[in-house]
Amino acid sequence: MFVLEQEDQELYDRIQEQNLNRQYELLTNCIEIGLKKGSVAFDKYMLWALNHVAVANISQFGGRFRVEPIYVGDHKPPHFKDVADWMDRYISTIQENWYIWSPTELAAYGLWRLNWIHPFIEGNGRTARATCYYLLCVRSGALLPGRKIVPERIREDRVGYENGLKAADQAWEDGHLDITKMEDYLAALLQAQLEDDGLPYQGG
């Protein structure tokens, strides 16, 4: 069962917003587990679950890696036959650098690289933003306070987000890893979240 955006925009938008709320509830559970288990809790099964809930009833291929080509503007993600290998590398890189990189470095890498691989048919951005926040919280050792969390702030500041992705893409194209621009962008959003008065985020 699924709804096409072209068939009923209002229903599609409502389902998508409800999915984001459900994804946040799942994400908080994942963060709690991550705080107990550390780097080993970060695995493909968590990513599958976060993607599945993000696209429930708007895509029939949620929660599984793509097995077909996908195109994103000027970016051409890896061939679908290579997705599983790239995702193994992605997860290993995060686990191996868990105590080396800062929370914002881990989150910047997690956000950029998942978008670069684009492992899912739908919901890659939503899954990447949730992953980014998971890494920020777990690596920082707490479910971070603030009534407007980083993923929501990213949605509101697309220019900085896209500039960070493009800068990291270009660096990788040139033969090196440089996520500095994305890290600076996330650090500013995180600071704004932590300084935001009010109750902790409740979804929405």
Predicted regions and their residues:
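FIC/Doc superfamily catalytic core
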Residues: M1-G204
